Swiss-Prot record:
An MF annotation (GO) of this entry: complement binding
Alphabetized Pfam families for the sequence: efb-c
Alphabetically ordered keywords of this record: Secreted, Signal, Virulence
Function summary: Extracellular fibrinogen-binding protein that plays an important role in virulence. By interacting with the alpha chain of fibrinogen and its derivative fibrin, enhances a non-functional interaction between fibrinogen and platelets and is responsible for repression of fibrinogen-dependent platelet aggregation. In addition, assembles a fibrinogen protective shield around the bacteria which results in impaired phagocytic clearance by the host.
Keyword Secreted: yes
Official protein name in the record: Fibrinogen-binding protein
Assembly description: Interacts with host fibrinogen alpha chain/FGA. Interacts with host complement protein C3.
Cell compartments where the protein resides: Secreted
Organism (species): Staphylococcus aureus (strain MRSA252)
Superkingdom of this protein's organism: Bacteria
Signal sequence residues: 1-29
GO cellular component labels: extracellular space
Length: 165
């Protein structure tokens, strides 16, 4: 009987100990992530300035061989690593526009010419201007399909008005 009582009391103590450690560990884990009161604003010579006006010197010891990985990305392109240090992140990459080839330049010129001829047809309402504008719109490349449809609609609107001389 004494052994059963001792076993039950040990199990109860173990259960209480396990629950308290899990509660404490979840509380510690919730502190590390999520919104922070202090956010880094700038970094200058390993001195981090926070938004509340405080400063902190940061150093990563040479013997620390654990791999660095990004833990959190802050505003102002500042990155926080798993060892608690801060650095500026990589600069955003901008894709330079590709140089235009002769073919694309010719296609754009045909589009501009078609726009000018449609504009002229809208002003004059003549049969010859209509033929020139329609031919130019038909020669516009399929790459400018949306603009081509808009030009065709403009020609159709003028034809619906009537009075083509």
């Amino acid at each position: 009987m004494k052994n059963k009582l001792i076993a039950k009391s040990l199990l109860a103590i173990a259960a209480i100990g396990i629950t308290t450690t899990t509660i404490a560990s979840t509380a510690d884990a919730s502190e590390g992530y999520g919104p922070r009161e202090k956010k880094p604003v700038s970094i200058n010579h390993n001195i981090v300035e926070y938004n509340d006006g405080t400063f902190k010197y940061q150093s990563r010891p040479k013997f620390n061989t654990t791999p660095k990985y990004i833990k959190f990305r802050h505003d102002y392109n500042i990155v926080e690593y798993n060892d608690g240090t801060f650095e500026y992140g990589a600069r955003p990459q901008f894709n330079k526009p590709a140089a235009k080839t002769e073919a694309t330049i010719k296609k754009e010129q045909k589009l501009i010419q078609a726009q000018n001829l449609v504009r002229e047809f809208e002003k004059t309402h003549t049969v010859s201007a209509h033929r020139k504008a329609q031919k130019a719109v038909n020669l516009v490349s399929f790459e400018y399909n949306v603009k081509k449809m808009i030009l065709q609609e403009r020609i159709d609107q003028v034809l619906k008005q009537g009075l083509v001389r």
